[in-house]
């Protein structure tokens, strides 16, 4: 349980750093049509229905006024969020693919990445943090985000 608390603290720090950098500096206008200035990519928690989840919705609601006139949208990470925790890697893979797409299509868009509960584990995989608990071989683990995308 102690390690899980540190994961939550780590995710909160990551989000706070992202918010600080977005609020403190001017975000350049997105270059491509249809690209937001800022996009929240969020992985919902275990057993939450598809979408951003309770924590993701709250974070998006907090981001909008903090960023003033800058356009903000959100991408809900597509993964089962079930009690089959080996599928957490599906969320990491979906987020990784979406990040690569955004970097290619909307290079000036600032990305804020977050997750809650199992979603935080999916996001942690992108940073190369190994999953907690038991694994069978390499199942349940996703490759870290390509440094060129970070």
Task: Give residue ranges: language-model regions.
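Bacterial N-terminal signal peptides that target proteins for export
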Residues: 1-13
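Cytoplasmic membrane-interface segments at the C-terminal ends of transmembrane helices
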Residues: 2-3, 27, 103
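Polar low-complexity intrinsically disordered regions enriched in Ser/Thr and small residues
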Residues: 13, 27-28, 143
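Hydrophobic alpha-helical membrane segments, chiefly transmembrane helices and signal peptide h-regions
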Residues: 14-23, 40, 120-125
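C-terminal region of N-terminal signal peptides and the immediate post-cleavage residues
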Residues: 18-35, 134
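Short amphipathic alpha-helical surface micro-motifs
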Residues: 22-24, 57-59, 132-139
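Active-site catalytic motif of lipid deacylating hydrolases and related acyltransferases
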Residues: 33-110
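Serine-dependent carboxylesterase/thioesterase catalytic core
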Residues: 93-114, 118-150
